[in-house]
């Protein structure tokens, strides 16, 4: 088993202690850039497709980077465990930047699709490497705070990213949505570099066991994920066939990439990964329905419906901040259970807003509660993942956590799209069904939350 030597850093000094300051700023900046690019592309892509006459490749432009990201997460986990996070970090930034440059200078849509796929691979390498860096560079009692900072780094772009991207497209042109990001990504990773040098190299002398098989299963999962994403954007029989094939592929491949015992919610890490997937699926599945429901059933403008989502994002940030400041609960299950309970109650409350007799504030308050739950849950599950990982397992387990998140969310998004497209037009019944499904997933997670506790002592990180 590989081992690493982490530097001794006084936890009391906080995230901005002299030896952590640059790494904290650089890591949070990279997370923000990954989030901004993921959100900004959705705003820019209609203009891109028109400009490059590439509407036929529109779905692949989104499904491609999702698929390569799935593959990269597995590769990064193996690489981090075998050689430490420095290689995946540098290569991740390189692939991310090169992909953005290819996309930003693409003369035709097919070139942009290639750039997006390269960018997605870099994002997958980076996302796992950053988790491993947290496990090796930060003292354990700062993990809740750094993951809260990571959560905020995702939330802020969700508030301002689409608007900024729209302004860039309108006044500078769509290419700058891609070309502007490398100017910040390179300085951000340079800030992290000194801290990476102090982590020490892995002393592994042989490849991680089963690496080739994991990469093979990851390729299968990546293809299935791409089909799932593309199928979710189709209609009719085509959508059903693509989604069915993709789900079968994921059922075959994904369990080989997730912790043993995942499907039966075994205690410890398998349940941690499962809860992350259930929460992501519940939240994202509800999030895509809410604006449509409020605009069609309650006659809200797109701006007003979007503000409801903004309230949820702000509540997510508040929840992340709170979990990093409150005393460590006596039971490791407390924060995950509280978070999933909030998501359950909040999502079910939003479903009531389909009734015209109830005020719109029901939806606002419900989604705020759900967002608060996500803020309590996500960082706490990230912390648990590192606590349940020996040094040579941090990459694989961080990869599993993020894979579960992405694959669960993609599956529910595709199924939600199929439900909404089943009739001639979505109505109260379909909105209620999708929101109840989302609440049910969160409720299942809340009932399983006690199984994150292994019954034995939790391994320290580092």
Regions found by a protein language model. Name each.
Residues 49-53, 106, 122, 137-139, ...:
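Short helix-loop-helix connector
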Residues 62-64, 115-125, 175-187, 239-246, ...:
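Structural signature of hydrophobic alpha-helical transmembrane segments
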Residues 49, 53-60, 148, 302-306, ...:
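Small-residue hotspots at the loop-to-helix junctions and early N-terminal turns
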Residues 47, 77-82, 167, 325:
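Membrane-interface helix termini in secondary transporters
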Residues 20-43, 62-65, 71-75, 86, ...:
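12-transmembrane solute porter fold
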Residues 80-207:
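Helix-loop-helix hairpins in multi-pass membrane proteins, especially solute transporters
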Residues 170-276, 282, 287:
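Hydrophobic transmembrane-helix bundles of small-molecule transporters
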Residues 1-19, 201-205, 451-462:
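Intrinsic disorder in cytosolic terminal tails and internal cytosolic loops
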